[in-house]
Every structure is written in structure tokens, then in C-alpha cells.
């Protein structure tokens, strides 16, 4: 079926938090949650659950929730459900996989990280390399455009892994992950991609990206707070993580420590189903996800243009970064005001647009913003033109000279 246009009014009706009258531009830190997701979480908690098994209804219900969540994430990311791993957070999963992957590293080996990334895709690799005696190579970016430098400037035949973001949570930059993956694979390096900030804004396909590992966080796309990693089951079979002796050696379960949060996994499935229904009625959920996310991308691009044009026309406002491909995330400063002052003034106007480095500390420093960062405004499918205009009015009327 052809993609339908996004209907903001219909979408907004599913989010109780929007009834508070706040314009939420803090989606890059975590989206608001629609009613079907909250109901799925509550339903799982109250329906009767046990540890996974096949004897009782409660055991089978838990098993079905896990199986369903893996299938849902696979449909979202274009992955194999047998390669979907759940964890407490994307940060925790990356630390776990860094520890596992680095067991084979040693002096002379190299790891590439970028200054564009969230620290969750930097520090785990830096620490793992230090423990192994391997060398960390830094891939920089242009502080004016926020575009990554060429990977070949730091890649060598000794590179074991390249860690890169699919979209900067601070500046919105969308690097060419496929080109990076292809280049890294030429020297047999693995590619670990942070897709946390991309997944809420664009159709995603693991094979198209060419990455070996792709992580994301459901709470950024209307779901509960946990982390997800997708990889080839065959690749996961080659890895031996730390685990308890009685726990299964099966993939992907052997990477999941302890009992899974079944209620949160039920929420993940509901979030993917919600996304799939945003702008498509195709019979297959993967097709619905792709069509709906294409509609999301188109809708958000229009609001992004409005926001960029509006902020760019206000005296005293500086926009940071001008990447060629980007998510609908804008970082800006106001002359004579600290980021915190802007954040507080916007909050008084009913606009949630926080100020920080947002854990992209290396990127903030490279962009000349130090450890303070700047104000970040992120657009979501429930954002409206009225929300954008409200932010622009607050900046223009309350934060800049008359």
C-alpha cells in the first residue's frame, strides 16, 4: 500500500502527556509515551507472569512476550529476531560487548572511535582498549559543518573495531554508515553502530547500513526504558560473554543477564506496533514500519526547515553545525545568555528544550561549546507547527534584545 500522510492530530490524541499543554522538544533524551504502550506494560504486569517456560500459562505468557519483542525489534531494524539482544540500556549493552569483544585484543591492535558520538559509544571502547593494551584512534569532525572526517585517515590494517554513530544526538549529523562499514570491512574490522538517535526519525535496515552491531533505545521511540542490540546470530555465536553457569548458552539469551523485564518488552512490542500504524496499512508489519517511518521523516523535515529558518532569522541566535544529512535536532545558543538561562526561560513559556552536552561531551568540546553544551530542540512525530512557532516566539520575544 502507498504511504499515507502523517496525521499529527491523530498521533497526538494517543499521548496523554500532551494534554498538559507543553511543547516537548526534549524527545532526543526520551520521547513521550502513547497510551497503547502504557497499557501493554500494565497489562503484562497484571495478567500473571512467571519465569519463561512451557508448563503453566504464566510461563508461556512470559515466553511469548520475549519472542514477540524480538520479532518487533527485528521488524523495526530489519534484523533477524534470533540476533536481538535486550539489556538495561544501550550504555550497559555496549559496555558488555566491549568487554566481550576486547578479549582478543592486545598491543598493536587499534580501535577507532569518533568525537561525534555519545560517550556511551566512546568510553566503553576506550576503557576496553586500555585494558587490552590496544591503541585508540580518534576520528574527528569539522566543527563548522559537524561532518565526520574520512575514516581512511585513521583506519589501518591493525584496526579491530570501528565505533560510530548513525546520527549525532547533539548536532543531528547522519554519517554515511554504509560507506564507513564498507571501508572498515576492507581491513576486517568490526563496525559497532549507535543507532539510538536515528531509529526514532528514519527507516532503519541493518543490512543496508552494513554494520555488524546496531544498538538503540526504545524509550527514544515511544517505548519503555531499556536497550536493544541487533546483530547477525552467526556473529553472536562466535562470542563468549560473561554469564552465570546455569544460564543458557543459546544465542541471543546468553548475552542477557538475569530475568528479562517482561513488562518492558511488552511495551517495546506495543511501541513498534504503534510506529507501524502511524501512516501505513500494509499487511506486513515490516512494510508498515518502513512506510510509516518514511512518512515520519518527511513530516519532521518540514518542521525542521521551519525551525532552522526561524532561528536563523533571530538576531543573537547561533546555530551549531550544518550537516548535509541530519535528524530533526537543532543545537543553538543565544548571545548573552547561558544555556541554562535559555532552558529556564523556555520552560516558563511551556517549551521543553533543555541545555547540556547531552553526554556527547567530545562533540560539545570539538564544537567549541566546552562542557556546557547548548540548547537542543528535537522534533518528534507529535510536534506541530504551533509548537515550533511557540519556541520561536519565546526565543525572539523573551531571550533576545528588542
For the regions a protein language model found, what residue spans apply to each?
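Pyridoxal 5′-phosphate
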Residues: 1-402
Amino acid at each position: 500500500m502507498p504511504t499515507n500522510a502523517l496525521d499529527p492530530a491523530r498521533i497526538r490524541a494517543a499521548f496523554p502527556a500532551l494534554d498538559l499543554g507543553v511543547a516537548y522538544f526534549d524527545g532526543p533524551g526520551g520521547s513521550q509515551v502513547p497510551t497503547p504502550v502504557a497499557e501493554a506494560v500494565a497489562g503484562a504486569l497484571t495478567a500473571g507472569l512467571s519465569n519463561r517456560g512451557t508448563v503453566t500459562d504464566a510461563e508461556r505468557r512470559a515466553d511469548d512476550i520475549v519472542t514477540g519483542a524480538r520479532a518487533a525489534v527485528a521488524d523495526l531494524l530489519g534484523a533477524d529476531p534470533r540476533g536481538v539482544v535486550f539489556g538495561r540500556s544501550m550504555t550497559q549493552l555496549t559496555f558488555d560487548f566491549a568487554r566481550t569483544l576486547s578479549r582478543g585484543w592486545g598491543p598493536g591492535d587499534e580501535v577507532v572511535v569518533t568525537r561525534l558520538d555519545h560517550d556511551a559509544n566512546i568510553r566503553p571502547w576506550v576503557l576496553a582498549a586500555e585494558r587490552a593494551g590496544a591503541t585508540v584512534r580518534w576520528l574527528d569532525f569539522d566543527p563548522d559543518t559537524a561532518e565526520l572526517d574520512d575514516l581512511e585517515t585513521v583506519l589501518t590494517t591493525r584496526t579491530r573495531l570501528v565505533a560510530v554513530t548513525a546520527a549525532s544526538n547533539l548536532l543531528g549529523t547522519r554519517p554515511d554508515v554504509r560507506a564507513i562499514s564498507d571501508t572498515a570491512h576492507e581491513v576486517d574490522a568490526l563496525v559497532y553502530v549507535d543507532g539510538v538517535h536515528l531509529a526514532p526519525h528514519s527507516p532503519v535496515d541493518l543490512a543496508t547500513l552494513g554494520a555488524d552491531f546496531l544498538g538503540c533505545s526504545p524509550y527514544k521511540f515511544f517505548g519503555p526504558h531499556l536497550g536493544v542490540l541487533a546483530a547477525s546470530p552467526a556473529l553472536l555465536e562466535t562470542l563468549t560473554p560473561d554469564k552465570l553457569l546455569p544460564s543458557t548458552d543459546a544465542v541471543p539469551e546468553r548475552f542477557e543477564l538475569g530475568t528479562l523485564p517482561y513488562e518492558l518488552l511488552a511495551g517495546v512490542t506495543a511501541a513498534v506496533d504503534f510506529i507501524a500504524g502511524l501512516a501505513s496499512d500494509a499487511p506486513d508489519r515490516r512494510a508498515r514500519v518502513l512506510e510509516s517511518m518514511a512518512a515520519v521523516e518527511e513530516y519532521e523535515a518540514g518542521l525542521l526547515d521551519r525551525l532552522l529558518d526561524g532561528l536563523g532569522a533571530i538576531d543573537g541566535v547561533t546555530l551549531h553545525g550544518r550537516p548535509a544529512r541530519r535528524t530533526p535536532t537543532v543545537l543553538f545558543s543565544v548571545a548573552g545568555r547561558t544555556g541554562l538561562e535559555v532552558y529556564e526561560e523556555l520552560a516558563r513559556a511551556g517549551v521543553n528544550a533543555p541545555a547540556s552536552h547531552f553526554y556527547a561531551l567530545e562533540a560539545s568540546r570539538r564544537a567549541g561549546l566546552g562542557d556546557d553544551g547548548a540548547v537542543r530542540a528535537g522534533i518528534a512525530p507529535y510536534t506541530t507547527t504551533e509548537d515550533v512557532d511557540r519556541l520561536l516566539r519565546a526565543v525572539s520575544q523573551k531571550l533576545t534584545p528588542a
